[in-house]
Amino acid sequence: MAAKMKKGALVRAVKETLENSLEAQASDSRFPSYLFDSKGEILDLTDEYALVRFYVPTPSVWLRLDQLELAE
């Protein structure tokens, strides 16, 4: 599925994958609901990560591609 993701695509975070990740263990594991309930836009991509901007007044966030799903 990561191959389908490109700049400008609308995505949302996958709760189960994000909560069980190494990133969640390294910091506060209480993620805000907008990550899962709203759509975000991919601003930039690397091999493993995407920079996602959610349409709330917060900074953009880097998430692993396997922690994202395309929004419908």
From Swiss-Prot:
Its main location: membrane. It is a peripheral membrane protein. Keywords: Membrane, NAD, NADP, Plastoquinone, Quinone, Thylakoid, Translocase, Transport. GO terms for molecular function: oxidoreductase activity, acting on NAD(P)H, quinone or similar compound as acceptor; quinone binding. It catalyses: a plastoquinone + NADH + (n+1) H(+)(in) = a plastoquinol + NAD(+) + n H(+)(out); a plastoquinone + NADPH + (n+1) H(+)(in) = a plastoquinol + NADP(+) + n H(+)(out). Its EC number is 7.1.1.-. Disulfide bonds: none annotated. It is found in: Cellular thylakoid membrane. GO terms for cellular component: plasma membrane-derived thylakoid membrane. Belongs to the complex I NdhO subunit family. HAMAP family: NDH1_NDH1O (MF_01354). NDH-1 can be composed of about 15 different subunits; different subcomplexes with different compositions have been identified which probably have different functions. NDH-1 shuttles electrons from an unknown electron donor, via FMN and iron-sulfur (Fe-S) centers, to quinones in the respiratory and/or the photosynthetic chain. The immediate electron acceptor for the enzyme in this species is believed to be plastoquinone. Couples the redox reaction to proton translocation, and thus conserves the redox energy in a proton gradient. Cyanobacterial NDH-1 also plays a role in inorganic carbon-concentration. This is NAD(P)H-quinone oxidoreductase subunit O. It comes from Rippkaea orientalis (strain PCC 8801 / RF-1). The lineage of its organism: Bacteria, Bacillati, Cyanobacteriota, Cyanophyceae, Oscillatoriophycideae.
